[in-house]
Amino acid sequence: MSDVSARSEGRSRRRRLLAVLLRDREGTTAIEFGFVAIPFFLLLFGLIEIGLSLFADQILNNAVLDAARLIRTGQAHAQGFDSGAFKAKVLENMSGFPVSADRLTIDVERINSFSSYTPKTLIEDGALTDKTAYNHGEAGDIVIVRALYRWPMVSSLMKTNYADLDSGDRLLVATAVFRNEPFPWTTQKPGG
Protein backbone atom coordinates (compact mmCIF):
# COMPACT_ATOMS: atom_id res chain seq x y z
CA MET A 1 0.00 0.00 0.00
CA SER A 2 1.45 3.29 -1.01
CA ASP A 3 1.80 6.42 1.07
CA VAL A 4 -0.77 8.26 -1.02
CA SER A 5 -3.43 5.60 -0.66
CA ALA A 6 -2.84 5.38 3.14
CA ARG A 7 -3.37 9.14 3.50
CA SER A 8 -6.44 8.96 1.32
CA GLU A 9 -7.86 6.11 3.40
CA GLY A 10 -7.16 8.07 6.63
CA ARG A 11 -9.01 11.09 5.27
CA SER A 12 -11.95 9.00 4.22
CA ARG A 13 -12.17 7.41 7.71
CA ARG A 14 -12.16 10.85 9.32
CA ARG A 15 -14.89 12.02 6.98
CA ARG A 16 -17.01 8.95 7.77
CA LEU A 17 -16.49 9.47 11.51
CA LEU A 18 -17.42 13.14 11.20
CA ALA A 19 -20.53 12.22 9.20
CA VAL A 20 -21.56 9.69 11.86
CA LEU A 21 -21.08 12.27 14.63
CA LEU A 22 -23.05 14.88 12.74
CA ARG A 23 -25.93 12.42 12.23
CA ASP A 24 -25.97 11.46 15.91
CA ARG A 25 -29.17 12.95 17.35
CA GLU A 26 -29.03 11.52 20.87
CA GLY A 27 -28.88 14.98 22.47
CA THR A 28 -25.54 14.85 24.24
CA THR A 29 -24.54 18.19 22.79
CA ALA A 30 -27.70 19.83 24.08
CA ILE A 31 -27.21 18.32 27.52
CA GLU A 32 -23.57 19.41 27.65
CA PHE A 33 -24.59 22.90 26.55
CA GLY A 34 -27.17 22.94 29.34
CA PHE A 35 -24.48 22.15 31.90
CA VAL A 36 -22.22 24.90 30.60
CA ALA A 37 -24.91 27.45 29.71
CA ILE A 38 -26.45 27.85 33.16
CA PRO A 39 -23.23 28.90 34.95
CA PHE A 40 -22.16 30.92 31.91
CA PHE A 41 -25.36 32.97 31.78
CA LEU A 42 -25.41 33.41 35.58
CA LEU A 43 -21.88 34.75 35.41
CA LEU A 44 -22.68 36.93 32.40
CA PHE A 45 -25.79 38.51 33.95
CA GLY A 46 -24.00 38.93 37.28
CA LEU A 47 -21.17 40.80 35.58
CA ILE A 48 -23.64 43.01 33.72
CA GLU A 49 -25.51 43.81 36.94
CA ILE A 50 -22.33 44.62 38.88
CA GLY A 51 -21.04 46.67 35.95
CA LEU A 52 -24.25 48.70 35.83
CA SER A 53 -24.10 49.41 39.57
CA LEU A 54 -20.46 50.54 39.29
CA PHE A 55 -21.37 52.74 36.32
CA ALA A 56 -24.27 54.26 38.28
CA ASP A 57 -21.91 54.84 41.23
CA GLN A 58 -19.52 56.79 39.01
CA ILE A 59 -22.36 58.88 37.58
CA LEU A 60 -23.56 59.62 41.14
CA ASN A 61 -20.05 60.68 42.17
CA ASN A 62 -19.75 63.07 39.23
CA ALA A 63 -23.23 64.49 39.86
CA VAL A 64 -22.43 65.14 43.54
CA LEU A 65 -19.10 66.79 42.72
CA ASP A 66 -20.80 69.11 40.23
CA ALA A 67 -23.63 69.97 42.61
CA ALA A 68 -21.26 70.39 45.58
CA ARG A 69 -19.41 73.04 43.61
CA LEU A 70 -22.52 75.23 43.98
CA ILE A 71 -22.18 74.99 47.76
CA ARG A 72 -18.41 75.53 47.76
CA THR A 73 -18.64 78.67 45.64
CA GLY A 74 -21.61 80.10 47.55
CA GLN A 75 -24.07 79.86 44.68
CA ALA A 76 -26.31 77.48 46.67
CA HIS A 77 -26.26 79.96 49.57
CA ALA A 78 -27.12 82.89 47.29
CA GLN A 79 -29.96 80.96 45.62
CA GLY A 80 -31.40 79.83 48.96
CA PHE A 81 -30.91 76.11 48.37
CA ASP A 82 -32.54 73.65 50.73
CA SER A 83 -32.30 69.86 50.71
CA GLY A 84 -34.91 69.54 47.96
CA ALA A 85 -33.22 72.05 45.66
CA PHE A 86 -29.83 70.41 46.14
CA LYS A 87 -31.34 66.97 45.51
CA ALA A 88 -32.94 68.30 42.32
CA LYS A 89 -29.54 69.60 41.20
CA VAL A 90 -27.91 66.20 41.79
CA LEU A 91 -30.72 64.51 39.85
CA GLU A 92 -30.35 67.06 37.05
CA ASN A 93 -26.64 66.22 36.85
CA MET A 94 -27.59 62.54 36.52
CA SER A 95 -30.01 63.21 33.65
CA GLY A 96 -29.92 60.65 30.91
CA PHE A 97 -29.52 57.83 33.42
CA PRO A 98 -32.61 56.07 34.83
CA VAL A 99 -32.73 57.12 38.49
CA SER A 100 -35.60 57.67 40.90
CA ALA A 101 -35.79 60.70 43.19
CA ASP A 102 -37.36 58.52 45.89
CA ARG A 103 -34.22 56.37 46.07
CA LEU A 104 -31.82 59.31 46.52
CA THR A 105 -30.99 60.62 50.00
CA ILE A 106 -28.96 63.80 50.53
CA ASP A 107 -26.97 64.71 53.64
CA VAL A 108 -25.13 68.05 53.76
CA GLU A 109 -23.40 68.86 57.01
CA ARG A 110 -21.20 71.70 58.29
CA ILE A 111 -18.43 70.59 60.65
CA ASN A 112 -16.12 72.54 62.96
CA SER A 113 -12.83 70.83 62.09
CA PHE A 114 -11.49 67.81 60.28
CA SER A 115 -9.88 66.38 63.41
CA SER A 116 -12.91 66.56 65.70
CA TYR A 117 -15.46 65.20 63.23
CA THR A 118 -17.27 61.98 64.09
CA PRO A 119 -19.31 60.56 61.22
CA LYS A 120 -22.94 59.88 61.95
CA THR A 121 -24.42 56.48 61.23
CA LEU A 122 -26.74 56.60 58.26
CA ILE A 123 -27.46 52.84 58.17
CA GLU A 124 -28.94 50.98 61.12
CA ASP A 125 -30.32 47.45 61.13
CA GLY A 126 -29.94 47.12 57.37
CA ALA A 127 -31.92 50.27 56.50
CA LEU A 128 -31.20 53.96 55.95
CA THR A 129 -31.86 56.18 58.94
CA ASP A 130 -33.56 59.57 58.86
CA LYS A 131 -30.57 61.32 60.47
CA THR A 132 -29.85 63.35 57.35
CA ALA A 133 -29.74 67.14 57.38
CA TYR A 134 -28.99 70.06 55.10
CA ASN A 135 -26.61 72.79 56.27
CA HIS A 136 -24.38 74.21 53.54
CA GLY A 137 -22.61 76.53 55.99
CA GLU A 138 -21.15 79.96 55.42
CA ALA A 139 -17.97 81.24 53.80
CA GLY A 140 -14.91 79.35 55.04
CA ASP A 141 -16.90 76.53 56.69
CA ILE A 142 -15.96 72.89 56.23
CA VAL A 143 -18.81 70.99 54.57
CA ILE A 144 -19.43 67.30 53.96
CA VAL A 145 -21.85 66.40 51.18
CA ARG A 146 -23.12 62.83 50.97
CA ALA A 147 -25.53 61.36 48.46
CA LEU A 148 -26.85 57.86 49.05
CA TYR A 149 -28.67 56.05 46.28
CA ARG A 150 -30.47 52.75 46.82
CA TRP A 151 -29.61 50.90 43.60
CA PRO A 152 -32.04 48.01 42.95
CA MET A 153 -30.42 44.63 42.39
CA VAL A 154 -32.41 42.60 39.86
CA SER A 155 -31.31 39.01 40.37
CA SER A 156 -31.87 37.19 43.64
CA LEU A 157 -28.28 35.93 43.56
CA MET A 158 -27.00 39.52 43.54
CA LYS A 159 -29.49 40.56 46.23
CA THR A 160 -28.10 38.00 48.64
CA ASN A 161 -24.40 38.46 47.83
CA TYR A 162 -23.94 42.07 46.71
CA ALA A 163 -26.70 44.07 48.40
CA ASP A 164 -25.95 46.31 51.41
CA LEU A 165 -29.48 46.87 52.68
CA ASP A 166 -32.05 44.39 53.94
CA SER A 167 -34.35 45.47 51.10
CA GLY A 168 -31.94 43.83 48.64
CA ASP A 169 -30.65 47.17 47.32
CA ARG A 170 -27.01 48.09 46.82
CA LEU A 171 -26.18 51.40 48.52
CA LEU A 172 -24.20 53.73 46.27
CA VAL A 173 -22.50 56.53 48.20
CA ALA A 174 -20.85 59.66 46.86
CA THR A 175 -19.04 62.03 49.23
CA ALA A 176 -17.44 65.43 48.81
CA VAL A 177 -15.55 67.17 51.64
CA PHE A 178 -14.34 70.74 51.20
CA ARG A 179 -13.96 74.16 52.75
CA ASN A 180 -16.30 76.80 51.35
CA GLU A 181 -14.65 79.57 49.42
CA PRO A 182 -14.82 83.13 50.75
CA PHE A 183 -18.11 84.19 49.18
CA PRO A 184 -17.87 87.71 47.75
CA TRP A 185 -21.05 88.89 49.53
CA THR A 186 -20.06 87.70 53.04
CA THR A 187 -17.02 88.07 55.21
CA GLN A 188 -14.86 85.07 55.92
CA LYS A 189 -14.80 83.80 59.48
CA PRO A 190 -11.62 84.46 61.46
CA GLY A 191 -9.15 81.60 61.13
CA GLY A 192 -11.20 80.18 58.23
Where are these regions (language model features)?
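Alpha-helical assembly-interface signal, strongest on the long, hydrophobic N-terminal helix that forms
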Residues: 2-92
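Short, conserved structural patches
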Residues: 2-7, 69-192
